[in-house]
A protein has these predicted regions:
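N-terminal leader/linker segments that precede catalytic domains of diphosphate-processing enzymes
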Residues: 2-318
Length: 318
Protein backbone atom coordinates (compact mmCIF):
# COMPACT_ATOMS: atom_id res chain seq x y z
CA UNK A 1 0.00 0.00 0.00
CA UNK A 2 1.14 3.59 -0.65
CA UNK A 3 3.40 4.67 2.22
CA UNK A 4 1.48 7.94 2.39
CA UNK A 5 -1.39 5.97 3.84
CA UNK A 6 0.62 4.63 6.76
CA UNK A 7 0.54 6.12 10.26
CA UNK A 8 2.00 9.62 10.15
CA UNK A 9 1.43 12.90 11.94
CA UNK A 10 -1.35 14.87 10.29
CA UNK A 11 -1.37 18.62 9.77
CA UNK A 12 -3.84 21.04 8.26
CA UNK A 13 -3.32 21.32 4.52
CA UNK A 14 -1.09 24.28 3.69
CA UNK A 15 -2.12 27.25 1.56
CA UNK A 16 0.10 25.87 -1.20
CA UNK A 17 -1.74 22.54 -1.13
CA UNK A 18 -5.10 24.29 -1.38
CA UNK A 19 -3.89 26.50 -4.23
CA UNK A 20 -2.75 23.42 -6.12
CA UNK A 21 -6.15 21.79 -5.57
CA UNK A 22 -7.91 24.89 -6.93
CA UNK A 23 -5.66 25.00 -10.00
CA UNK A 24 -6.30 21.31 -10.66
CA UNK A 25 -10.04 21.86 -10.43
CA UNK A 26 -9.91 24.84 -12.81
CA UNK A 27 -7.70 22.94 -15.26
CA UNK A 28 -9.99 19.93 -15.39
CA UNK A 29 -13.03 22.20 -15.69
CA UNK A 30 -11.51 24.00 -18.68
CA UNK A 31 -10.45 20.71 -20.28
CA UNK A 32 -13.97 19.31 -19.84
CA UNK A 33 -15.61 22.41 -21.32
CA UNK A 34 -13.22 22.43 -24.28
CA UNK A 35 -13.91 18.73 -24.90
CA UNK A 36 -17.66 19.34 -24.81
CA UNK A 37 -17.26 22.20 -27.25
CA UNK A 38 -15.18 20.09 -29.63
CA UNK A 39 -17.73 17.26 -29.50
CA UNK A 40 -20.54 19.71 -30.28
CA UNK A 41 -18.70 21.32 -33.21
CA UNK A 42 -17.47 18.04 -34.67
CA UNK A 43 -20.95 16.52 -34.48
CA UNK A 44 -22.31 19.47 -36.43
CA UNK A 45 -19.50 19.13 -38.97
CA UNK A 46 -20.07 15.37 -39.07
CA UNK A 47 -16.44 14.59 -38.14
CA UNK A 48 -16.91 11.48 -35.99
CA UNK A 49 -13.19 10.85 -35.46
CA UNK A 50 -12.67 14.23 -33.80
CA UNK A 51 -15.72 13.89 -31.56
CA UNK A 52 -14.61 10.38 -30.56
CA UNK A 53 -11.19 11.64 -29.45
CA UNK A 54 -12.79 14.52 -27.54
CA UNK A 55 -15.16 12.02 -25.93
CA UNK A 56 -12.22 9.97 -24.67
CA UNK A 57 -10.64 13.10 -23.20
CA UNK A 58 -13.96 14.06 -21.59
CA UNK A 59 -14.24 10.59 -20.09
CA UNK A 60 -10.97 11.28 -18.30
CA UNK A 61 -11.39 14.97 -17.42
CA UNK A 62 -14.96 14.90 -16.09
CA UNK A 63 -14.32 12.32 -13.30
CA UNK A 64 -11.05 14.11 -12.51
CA UNK A 65 -12.97 17.39 -12.23
CA UNK A 66 -15.43 15.79 -9.80
CA UNK A 67 -12.57 14.33 -7.75
CA UNK A 68 -10.89 17.73 -7.60
CA UNK A 69 -14.10 19.25 -6.20
CA UNK A 70 -14.19 16.53 -3.53
CA UNK A 71 -10.53 17.14 -2.70
CA UNK A 72 -11.26 20.73 -1.66
CA UNK A 73 -13.14 19.42 1.39
CA UNK A 74 -10.12 17.39 2.53
CA UNK A 75 -8.58 20.04 4.79
CA UNK A 76 -6.42 17.68 6.87
CA UNK A 77 -4.14 14.83 5.94
CA UNK A 78 -6.29 12.19 7.64
CA UNK A 79 -9.18 13.19 5.37
CA UNK A 80 -6.89 12.96 2.35
CA UNK A 81 -5.82 9.47 3.42
CA UNK A 82 -9.44 8.40 3.89
CA UNK A 83 -10.30 9.64 0.40
CA UNK A 84 -7.33 7.77 -1.13
CA UNK A 85 -8.33 4.56 0.63
CA UNK A 86 -11.89 4.88 -0.67
CA UNK A 87 -10.81 5.57 -4.23
CA UNK A 88 -8.36 2.69 -4.08
CA UNK A 89 -11.21 0.50 -2.77
CA UNK A 90 -9.20 -0.47 0.29
CA UNK A 91 -12.17 0.68 2.39
CA UNK A 92 -15.87 1.31 1.80
CA UNK A 93 -18.39 3.49 3.60
CA UNK A 94 -19.22 0.50 5.82
CA UNK A 95 -15.63 -0.31 6.81
CA UNK A 96 -15.25 -0.26 10.59
CA UNK A 97 -12.70 2.25 11.87
CA UNK A 98 -11.21 2.09 15.36
CA UNK A 99 -10.69 5.50 16.97
CA UNK A 100 -8.70 6.37 20.08
CA UNK A 101 -8.72 10.05 21.15
CA UNK A 102 -6.41 11.02 24.01
CA UNK A 103 -4.46 13.81 25.67
CA UNK A 104 -0.82 13.64 26.74
CA UNK A 105 1.31 15.80 29.04
CA UNK A 106 4.76 17.07 28.23
CA UNK A 107 6.52 17.37 31.60
CA UNK A 108 10.07 18.55 31.00
CA UNK A 109 12.75 19.57 33.47
CA UNK A 110 16.18 20.40 32.14
CA UNK A 111 16.73 18.17 29.12
CA UNK A 112 14.64 15.27 30.42
CA UNK A 113 10.97 14.32 30.29
CA UNK A 114 9.01 12.72 33.11
CA UNK A 115 7.34 9.47 32.07
CA UNK A 116 5.18 7.05 34.05
CA UNK A 117 4.82 3.29 33.75
CA UNK A 118 1.91 1.84 31.82
CA UNK A 119 0.75 -0.61 34.46
CA UNK A 120 -2.26 -1.96 32.56
CA UNK A 121 -0.63 -3.13 29.37
CA UNK A 122 2.87 -2.84 28.00
CA UNK A 123 4.65 -1.94 31.28
CA UNK A 124 6.61 0.58 29.22
CA UNK A 125 7.14 4.18 30.26
CA UNK A 126 4.95 6.78 28.60
CA UNK A 127 3.68 10.36 29.08
CA UNK A 128 1.17 11.23 31.76
CA UNK A 129 -2.26 11.21 30.11
CA UNK A 130 -4.85 8.93 28.61
CA UNK A 131 -7.97 8.73 26.50
CA UNK A 132 -10.65 11.37 26.78
CA UNK A 133 -13.80 10.47 28.71
CA UNK A 134 -17.38 10.74 27.48
CA UNK A 135 -19.74 12.55 29.84
CA UNK A 136 -23.48 12.64 30.46
CA UNK A 137 -25.57 11.12 27.66
CA UNK A 138 -22.91 11.58 24.99
CA UNK A 139 -22.42 7.86 24.42
CA UNK A 140 -26.14 7.38 23.83
CA UNK A 141 -26.13 10.36 21.45
CA UNK A 142 -23.23 8.86 19.51
CA UNK A 143 -25.04 5.52 19.26
CA UNK A 144 -28.16 7.24 17.95
CA UNK A 145 -26.29 9.45 15.48
CA UNK A 146 -23.43 7.27 14.26
CA UNK A 147 -24.13 3.75 15.55
CA UNK A 148 -20.83 3.63 17.43
CA UNK A 149 -19.62 0.36 18.92
CA UNK A 150 -17.41 -0.32 21.92
CA UNK A 151 -13.76 -1.01 21.25
CA UNK A 152 -13.24 -4.77 21.11
CA UNK A 153 -9.43 -4.61 21.12
CA UNK A 154 -8.95 -3.39 24.69
CA UNK A 155 -10.82 -4.96 27.59
CA UNK A 156 -13.61 -2.80 29.00
CA UNK A 157 -14.26 -2.42 32.72
CA UNK A 158 -15.95 0.11 34.99
CA UNK A 159 -13.06 2.54 34.66
CA UNK A 160 -12.88 2.38 30.86
CA UNK A 161 -16.51 2.03 29.74
CA UNK A 162 -16.73 5.73 28.83
CA UNK A 163 -13.37 5.99 27.11
CA UNK A 164 -13.02 7.58 23.69
CA UNK A 165 -11.94 4.22 22.29
CA UNK A 166 -14.70 3.29 19.89
CA UNK A 167 -15.51 1.72 16.54
CA UNK A 168 -17.44 3.52 13.83
CA UNK A 169 -18.24 3.09 10.14
CA UNK A 170 -16.07 5.14 7.79
CA UNK A 171 -19.05 7.07 6.40
CA UNK A 172 -19.69 8.66 9.82
CA UNK A 173 -16.07 9.44 10.66
CA UNK A 174 -15.92 13.07 9.52
CA UNK A 175 -19.11 14.06 11.32
CA UNK A 176 -17.91 12.19 14.40
CA UNK A 177 -14.63 14.15 14.50
CA UNK A 178 -16.48 17.42 13.92
CA UNK A 179 -18.81 16.68 16.83
CA UNK A 180 -15.83 15.77 19.03
CA UNK A 181 -14.39 19.24 18.43
CA UNK A 182 -17.58 21.25 18.76
CA UNK A 183 -20.63 19.73 20.45
CA UNK A 184 -19.57 16.57 22.25
CA UNK A 185 -20.21 16.32 25.99
CA UNK A 186 -16.78 15.15 27.12
CA UNK A 187 -13.58 16.05 28.88
CA UNK A 188 -12.27 19.32 27.53
CA UNK A 189 -8.83 20.87 27.29
CA UNK A 190 -9.68 23.46 29.95
CA UNK A 191 -9.63 20.71 32.61
CA UNK A 192 -7.32 17.78 31.98
CA UNK A 193 -6.67 17.14 35.65
CA UNK A 194 -8.11 13.62 35.90
CA UNK A 195 -5.23 11.62 34.42
CA UNK A 196 -2.67 13.89 36.10
CA UNK A 197 -4.20 13.13 39.48
CA UNK A 198 -4.54 9.39 38.80
CA UNK A 199 -0.97 8.94 37.60
CA UNK A 200 0.99 11.41 39.73
CA UNK A 201 -1.02 12.68 42.71
CA UNK A 202 -2.79 9.50 43.85
CA UNK A 203 0.43 7.49 43.52
CA UNK A 204 2.28 9.97 45.69
CA UNK A 205 4.81 10.94 43.04
CA UNK A 206 4.04 14.64 43.55
CA UNK A 207 1.82 16.47 46.02
CA UNK A 208 0.47 19.56 44.30
CA UNK A 209 -2.82 21.44 44.67
CA UNK A 210 -2.81 23.18 41.30
CA UNK A 211 -1.17 23.03 37.88
CA UNK A 212 -0.92 25.27 34.84
CA UNK A 213 -0.40 23.95 31.33
CA UNK A 214 -0.22 25.20 27.74
CA UNK A 215 -2.01 23.62 24.79
CA UNK A 216 0.73 22.75 22.28
CA UNK A 217 -1.39 21.32 19.47
CA UNK A 218 -2.82 18.08 18.17
CA UNK A 219 -1.22 14.98 16.71
CA UNK A 220 -3.52 13.06 14.42
CA UNK A 221 -2.54 10.05 12.38
CA UNK A 222 -3.59 9.35 8.86
CA UNK A 223 -6.27 6.72 8.51
CA UNK A 224 -4.16 3.56 8.33
CA UNK A 225 -4.34 -0.19 8.82
CA UNK A 226 -2.98 -0.97 12.28
CA UNK A 227 -0.84 -4.10 12.23
CA UNK A 228 -1.20 -4.65 15.97
CA UNK A 229 -5.02 -4.75 16.09
CA UNK A 230 -5.55 -5.65 12.40
CA UNK A 231 -8.09 -2.90 11.81
CA UNK A 232 -8.13 0.56 10.21
CA UNK A 233 -7.43 3.18 12.87
CA UNK A 234 -7.52 6.93 13.46
CA UNK A 235 -5.57 8.10 16.51
CA UNK A 236 -5.73 11.57 18.03
CA UNK A 237 -3.56 13.00 20.80
CA UNK A 238 -3.85 16.53 22.16
CA UNK A 239 -0.51 17.62 23.64
CA UNK A 240 -0.29 19.94 26.66
CA UNK A 241 2.88 21.20 28.33
CA UNK A 242 3.12 21.55 32.10
CA UNK A 243 4.23 25.05 33.16
CA UNK A 244 5.61 24.33 36.62
CA UNK A 245 6.07 26.89 39.35
CA UNK A 246 9.54 27.28 40.86
CA UNK A 247 8.52 24.98 43.71
CA UNK A 248 7.09 22.39 41.33
CA UNK A 249 10.24 22.43 39.21
CA UNK A 250 12.29 21.87 42.35
CA UNK A 251 10.05 18.88 43.18
CA UNK A 252 10.68 17.44 39.72
CA UNK A 253 14.43 17.89 40.06
CA UNK A 254 14.27 16.11 43.40
CA UNK A 255 12.45 13.21 41.74
CA UNK A 256 15.31 12.91 39.26
CA UNK A 257 17.70 12.08 42.11
CA UNK A 258 15.51 9.24 43.36
CA UNK A 259 14.92 5.78 41.91
CA UNK A 260 11.40 4.46 41.40
CA UNK A 261 9.75 1.90 39.13
CA UNK A 262 6.71 4.19 38.95
CA UNK A 263 8.40 6.85 36.85
CA UNK A 264 11.40 7.46 34.62
CA UNK A 265 13.17 10.53 33.25
CA UNK A 266 14.35 10.31 29.64
CA UNK A 267 16.02 12.61 27.12
CA UNK A 268 14.50 13.28 23.71
CA UNK A 269 17.11 10.99 22.14
CA UNK A 270 16.19 8.16 24.51
CA UNK A 271 12.50 8.67 23.75
CA UNK A 272 13.06 8.60 20.00
CA UNK A 273 15.06 5.36 20.34
CA UNK A 274 12.35 3.93 22.66
CA UNK A 275 14.97 3.46 25.37
CA UNK A 276 17.10 1.13 23.27
CA UNK A 277 20.84 1.72 23.66
CA UNK A 278 22.98 -0.30 21.27
CA UNK A 279 26.22 0.98 22.81
CA UNK A 280 25.45 -0.49 26.23
CA UNK A 281 23.60 -3.52 24.86
CA UNK A 282 20.23 -2.46 26.33
CA UNK A 283 18.06 -3.70 23.47
CA UNK A 284 14.70 -3.92 25.21
CA UNK A 285 12.21 -1.18 24.39
CA UNK A 286 11.44 0.63 27.65
CA UNK A 287 9.47 3.58 26.27
CA UNK A 288 6.14 3.57 24.42
CA UNK A 289 6.38 4.58 20.78
CA UNK A 290 3.66 7.25 21.14
CA UNK A 291 5.81 9.14 23.69
CA UNK A 292 7.72 10.98 20.96
CA UNK A 293 4.55 12.91 20.10
CA UNK A 294 5.09 14.98 23.25
CA UNK A 295 8.72 16.06 22.87
CA UNK A 296 9.61 19.61 21.87
CA UNK A 297 11.34 18.46 18.70
CA UNK A 298 7.98 17.30 17.29
CA UNK A 299 5.88 20.34 18.26
CA UNK A 300 6.23 21.87 14.80
CA UNK A 301 4.40 18.85 13.36
CA UNK A 302 1.32 19.33 15.54
CA UNK A 303 -1.96 20.70 14.21
CA UNK A 304 -2.67 24.21 15.47
CA UNK A 305 -6.31 23.94 16.53
CA UNK A 306 -8.34 26.80 18.01
CA UNK A 307 -6.93 26.17 21.51
CA UNK A 308 -3.32 26.45 20.34
CA UNK A 309 -1.14 28.47 22.71
CA UNK A 310 -3.79 28.92 25.40
CA UNK A 311 -2.88 28.29 29.03
CA UNK A 312 -5.12 26.77 31.67
CA UNK A 313 -4.90 26.53 35.44
CA UNK A 314 -6.77 23.72 37.20
CA UNK A 315 -7.19 22.67 40.81
CA UNK A 316 -6.18 19.15 41.79
CA UNK A 317 -8.66 17.50 44.13
CA UNK A 318 -8.41 13.85 45.12
Amino acid sequence: MDSALQEQGSMFQSAGDNSMKIWKMISFAILSLVSLGIIFIFEIKDWPAGSSIAGIVLGFSLPAFWHSIQDLSDTTNWKVSQRKLRRGRFISNETIIRISFAYLYRIKVGNKYLLVKNERGTKKYQPVGGVYKLKGNEKIELKNLYHIKDDNKVSIDESSCNDYRLRIESKYLRKFVKRFDKKAERERVDDLSREFMEELIEKGIVNWDQITYRFCGRHMTNLYFGKHFQIYELLLADIVELLPTVEQENDLRQLMTQHSDLYHFATAEEIISLGVNTETGELEELIGDHTKKTIQEYEGQLMKTRDFGKTYTVELHT
